[in-house]
């Protein structure tokens, strides 16, 4: 890597963004698992409310391009299928 100022700045920016993106992706995985566990435990009413929260988080991540919009749509669809069973 070059040692000029702009290359160093880009490196710092990339590191900050990577840390933030990993954090958001980890949070998404955690809340998806919580929603699935609620559904499997038979807590439908709680799961429906929590699904709205999960969908909102997925849409936000897709809008910020942390995950692809199709991935967000796929995850919401699969959670919804589980919820309606």
Swiss-Prot record:
Record-linked InterPro entries: Ribosomal_bS20, Ribosomal_bS20_sf
Residue ranges of coiled coil: none
Gene Ontology MF terms in the entry: small ribosomal subunit rRNA binding; structural constituent of ribosome
Pfam families attached to this UniProt entry: Ribosomal_S20p
Domain of life: Bacteria
A single cellular component GO annotation: cytosol
Keywords: Ribonucleoprotein, Ribosomal protein, RNA-binding, rRNA-binding
SUPFAM superfamilies: Ribosomal protein S20
GO biological process terms on file: translation
HAMAP family, sorted: Ribosomal_bS20
Membership in a protein family: Belongs to the bacterial ribosomal protein bS20 family.
Chain's role: Binds directly to 16S ribosomal RNA.
Protein's UniProt name: Small ribosomal subunit protein bS20
Gene: rpsT
């Amino acid at each position: 890597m070059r040692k000029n100022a702009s290359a160093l700045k880009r490196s710092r920016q990339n590191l900050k963004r990577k840390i933030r993106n990993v954090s958001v992706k980890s949070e998404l995985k955690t809340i998806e698992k919580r929603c699935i566990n609620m559904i499997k435990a038979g807590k439908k009413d709680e799961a429906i409310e929590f699904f709205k929260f999960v969908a909102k988080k997925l849409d936000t991540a897709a809008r910020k391009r942390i995950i692809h919009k199709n991935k967000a749509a796929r995850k919401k669809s699969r959670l919804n299928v589980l919820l309606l069973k």
